[in-house]
């Protein structure tokens, strides 16, 4: 082996760099542990929110202080956080969201809210098409506009030929030119949204945030590992920062309308309860409009508006208030429906014609602990345009009022100052409201005109964090359009911590099993392979830390798979060396041949390249967990090759040079798989029948039963909910049917006191409050099982006690992005198959080899799908078909190809050496000679995967089950499917030659 010194130097330096990079993770966790201990001392109770505040204070206090001194250099806590290894949400907890900037809103803004019928009909048609299309909203709008336009052009003065765009869009400009301009404007708006969101996130206070644009889709991905206050995060990233100042009606001006509305609601409900359902459909529909999905006459106790809304009645001048009523937080959606009902709105007097009702931004607690939200009556107008808007704000900052309460101080420009002075002059003795994103933050009485352009937002319940966030969004600027969360994953820190513990336990056990097996099977050579394996693991984690890559649960699975591949490389080499020794060649010659291209190296490189190609395709087309898996897989392939080929070689060469006794077997493994001569091809028809029967059974199951699609493929919401006792999933599903209107999927998740609840309830509805309303519906539905747990404690976010009730993790996927995820996953599968087909064709120069490999892969995938279809209904773990499952399928593809390529490489070698043999004999002998390697590698890989499956977290069991089935089937198919099909598709004359 040449350049031993250089390889040693490189390995030592690489190892030291890896240790150096990983040290930051160690030091960072030590500081965070100190912060947690400090918080526990300051807050002796189990109040997770208070503890989080003190933790943050401690970390802020040491952020710029020296916490590590390495003599030659030192580091602050901020320095450490920048350099430590990033953990994904599934290991650390936090929020991962994909936001869709509303292109529709941007188009409406560019048209100055055009009332052109063709324009608005095209927007509506594009909305409908978007639900079932993977195309962009803008392209769909163009297609629909051209269908409806006839003679109308996009440059029409009533559409985009406006004053604001006249410098860019000329009169009678062609549609093609206008399309290009609109695309530029949309891109500019999305860039603005990206900059605004990045500015907000930078000031949020989490370490290692990540924000990136997703191609030209108008989507922005935000990752906030470790974020605990989920409600605060979602408000920060979805807030449009639309600040408005409005005049407000007093309670005295609205109360008579409320009394009339109350009577009307009572009348409608009474009519419904006394009418015959089959004859009075219209009235039933009216009730459905009012009560929505919860309408059930058996549940209504008091049949009027005031069942849900508590009016604030003014009987004299002293009782005048801007607060017109209150409602329980969980009843606000009901009040909204009632007040939006057409028959109720028809009762509005002329002076209240344009009134709009907005809620306070934060609930207050009544004397009995009930959370109540205040309702305000805003004096709107025909155009719904506020007298003063946020564009007049020059600066905003968090300060404290004279009463030492947190507030947001704002400074207006000259124009805004004049408008504010005018507004406060005209409304002396009345009320004005400061509204942010349709929530009222303050609605004080105006005592005198306010001059100078300074004002403040000072809600009585505002915290310092909330005031800081409001100042942040106001300074960062207004989003050009609504940013809707189309996919969000929330993992509570408790679940993340448990996932880390389970993952590293299973990881440690898996490694220990592999190390023991290699030593038991190969003796001293196995010990050298173990050392190389340990170096390989160090290199993988060192590279992840160096490049600030994110480690996730699927990423850990990727590392473990590469460990299996690293073992495979050593097994191939050792088996070749054993062959040389069996042929009475010297140890030195056998080692040299084993590590040569003509020996094991060719098969190792071919096998790893096919898996690498799969990893690249996964990384290009995959998202989320698939990307994390692909990244660790690709890194692991590189380090596995280096350690197996060079580190193991260095150790073995050193032993050979010193004349040490070197064994490649033990008393246990001696003689295994030697002198085998199995006639595989004679049994191929039996294999075809067995495989065909299994695949047919799977296809019948898929056609009749189907597969359980996860929310990332079909859209919906899934909640992982923990209870303080064991739960019956069927009973909970039946209970929730009443709350959601249809039966959700409920399954035990991990332990018997944890359930995964999946529902499509209100997934099509839009609006910033929908997610909150769905969570509140879930809370109400589960109330019989969670006792006195408050809604705030039930929601996801802060760390929960081991047996506390509440949402541990939450995921939502909009149906529009679900289609995109499914499409990209299918492209990943077919793309990897195509690339591998071409690579095998290039390497082996025969179509029959490619055909055999690809058919075997299809065989493996179909069997895994069939097993999932047949077993998902009764298996005690989650078996959803989603992104992680696709990652598992592609891993099966990679493993199966790896196995097949090693065998094909041996067939090619034997065909070149044994030219006098029949082709069938060549194939059988080649298969027999590689059987030891095939079984050994499969056994160690299955050993590793079984350890993870048994001891890993609940979130990875379905993933590992697919891999276990795939590896077992892949081993079988490489022997009994790929090779026989390759043989049967090889032309007769080629066999004879």
Question: Residue ranges of each PLM-predicted region?
Answer:
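Interfacial helix-loop-helix hairpins and adjacent transmembrane helices
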Residues: 1-18, 24-81, 85, 105-142, ...
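Hydrophobic alpha-helical transmembrane segments of membrane transport and translocation systems
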Residues: 8, 12, 535, 542-543, ...
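Non-transmembrane, solvent-exposed regions of membrane trafficking/translocation machinery
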Residues: 23-31, 44-45, 53-74, 79-437, ...
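Juxtamembrane "pre-transmembrane" interface segments
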Residues: 223, 456, 461, 465-509, ...
């Amino acid at each position: 082996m040449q350049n031993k010194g250089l390889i040693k130097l490189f390995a030592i330096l690489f190892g030291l760099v890896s240790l150096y990079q990983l040290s930051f993770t160690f030091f960072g966790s030590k500081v965070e542990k100190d912060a947690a201990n400090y918080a526990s001392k300051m807050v002796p109770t189990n109040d997770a929110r208070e503890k989080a505040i003190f933790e943050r204070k401690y970390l802020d206090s040491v952020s710029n202080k020296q916490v590590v001194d390495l003599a030659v250099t030192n580091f602050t806590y901020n320095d450490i956080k920048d350099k430590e290894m990033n953990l994904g949400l599934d290991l650390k907890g936090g929020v991962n969201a994909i936001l869709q900037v509303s292109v529709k809103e941007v188009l409406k803004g560019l048209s100055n809210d055009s009332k052109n019928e063709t324009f608005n009909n095209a927007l509506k048609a594009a909305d409908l098409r978007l639900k079932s299309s993977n195309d962009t909203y803008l392209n769909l709008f163009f297609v629909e506009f051209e269908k409806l336009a006839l003679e109308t052009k996009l440059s029409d003065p009533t559409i985009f030929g406006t004053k604001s765009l006249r410098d860019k869009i000329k009169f009678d400009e062609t549609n093609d030119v206008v399309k290009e301009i609109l695309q530029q404007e949309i891109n500019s708006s999305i860039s603005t949204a990206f900059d605004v969101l990045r500015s907000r996130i930078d000031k949020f206070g989490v370490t290692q945030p990540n924000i990136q644009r997703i191609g030209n889709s108008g989507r922005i991905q935000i990752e906030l590992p470790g974020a605990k206050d989920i409600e605060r995060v979602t408000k920060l990233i979805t807030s449009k920062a639309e600040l408005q100042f409005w005049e407000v009606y007093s309670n005295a001006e609205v109360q008579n309308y409320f009394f009339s509305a109350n009577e009307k609601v009572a009348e409608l409900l009474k009519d419904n309860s006394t009418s015959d359902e089959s004859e009075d459909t219209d009235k039933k529909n009216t009730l459905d409009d009012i009560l929505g999905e919860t309408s059930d006459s058996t549940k209504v106790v008091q049949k009027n508006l005031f069942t849900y809304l508590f009016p604030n009645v003014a009987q004299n001048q002293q009782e005048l208030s801007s607060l017109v009523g209150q409602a329980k937080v969980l009843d606000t959606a009901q009040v909204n429906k009632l007040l939006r009902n057409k028959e109720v709105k028809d009762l509005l007097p002329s002076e209240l014609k344009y009134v709009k009702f907005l809620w306070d931004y934060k609930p207050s607690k009544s004397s009995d602990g009930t959370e109540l939200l205040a309702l305000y009556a805003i004096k709107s107008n025909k155009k719904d345009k506020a007298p003063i808007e946020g564009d007049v704000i020059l600066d905003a900052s968090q300060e404290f009022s004279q009463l030492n309460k947190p507030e947001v101080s704002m400074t207006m420009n000259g124009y805004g100052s004049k408008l504010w002075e005018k507004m406060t002059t005209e409304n002396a003795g009345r009320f004005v409201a400061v509204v942010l994103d349709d929530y009222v933050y303050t609605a004080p009485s105006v005592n005198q005109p306010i001059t100078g352009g300074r004002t403040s937002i000072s809600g009585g319940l505002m915290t310092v964090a909330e005031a800081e966030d409001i100042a942040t969004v106001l300074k960062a600027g207004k989003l050009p359009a609504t940013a809707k969360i189309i996919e969000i994953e929330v993992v509570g820190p408790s679940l993340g911590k448990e996932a880390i513990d389970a993952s590293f336990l299973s990881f440690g056990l898996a490694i220990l099993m592999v190390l023991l097996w290699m030593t038991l099977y190969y003796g001293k050579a196995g010990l050298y392979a173990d050392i190389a394996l340990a170096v390989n693991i160090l290199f993988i984690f060192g590279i992840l830390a160096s490049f600030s890559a994110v480690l996730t649960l699927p990423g850990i699975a990727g590392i473990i798979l590469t460990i299996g591949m690293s073992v495979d490389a050593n097994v191939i080499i050792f088996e070749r060396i054993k062959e040389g020794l069996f042929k009475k060649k010297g140890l030195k010659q056998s080692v040299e041949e084993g590590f040569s291209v003509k020996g094991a190296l060719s098969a190792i490189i071919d096998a790893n390249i096919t898996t690498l190609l799969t990893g690249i395709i996964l990384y290009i087309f995959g998202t989320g967990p698939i990307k994390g898996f692909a990244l660790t897989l690709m890194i692991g392939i590189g380090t596995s090759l280096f350690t197996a080929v060079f580190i193991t070689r260095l150790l073995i060469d050193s032993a050979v040079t010193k004349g040490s006794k070197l064994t490649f077997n033990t008393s246990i493994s001696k003689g295994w798989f030697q002198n085998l001569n199995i006639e595989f091809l004679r049994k191929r028809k039996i294999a075809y029948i067995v495989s065909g029967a299994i695949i047919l059974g799977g296809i019948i199951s898929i056609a009749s039963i189907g597969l359980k699609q996860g929310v990332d493929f079909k859209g919906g919401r899934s909640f992982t909910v923990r209870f303080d006792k064991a739960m019956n999933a069927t009973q909970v599903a039946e209970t929730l049917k009443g709350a959601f209107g249809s039966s959700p999927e409920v399954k035990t998740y991990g332990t018997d006191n944890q359930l995964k609840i999946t529902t499509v309830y209100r997934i099509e509805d839009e609006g910033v409050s929908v997610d909150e309303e769905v969570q509140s519906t879930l809370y109400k539905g589960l109330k019989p099982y969670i006792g006195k747990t408050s809604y705030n404690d039930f929601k996801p976010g802060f760390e929960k006690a081991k047996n506390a009730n509440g949402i541990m993790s939450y995921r939502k996927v909009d149906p529009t992005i679900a289609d995109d995820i499914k499409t990209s996953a299918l492209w990943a599968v077919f793309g990897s198959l195509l690339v591998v087909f071409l690579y095998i064709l290039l390497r082996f120069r025969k179509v029959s080899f490619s055909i055999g490999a690809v058919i075997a892969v299809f065989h493996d995938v179909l069997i895994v799908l069939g097993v999932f279809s047949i077993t998902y209904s009764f298996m005690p773990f989650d078996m959803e078909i989603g992104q992680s499952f696709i990652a598992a399928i592609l891993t099966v593809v990679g493993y199966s190809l790896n196995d097949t390529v090693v065998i094909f490489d041996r067939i090619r070698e034997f065909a070149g050496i044994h030219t006098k043999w029949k082709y069938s004999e060549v194939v059988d002998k080649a298969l027999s000679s590689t059987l030891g390697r095939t079984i050994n590698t499969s056994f160690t890989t299955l050993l590793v995967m079984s350890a993870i499956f048994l001891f890993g977290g609940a979130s990875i069991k379905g993933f590992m089950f697919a891999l276990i089935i795939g590896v077992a089937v892949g081993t079988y198919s490489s022997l009994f499917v790929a090779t026989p099909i390759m043989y049967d598709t090889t032309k007769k004359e080629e066999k004879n030659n």
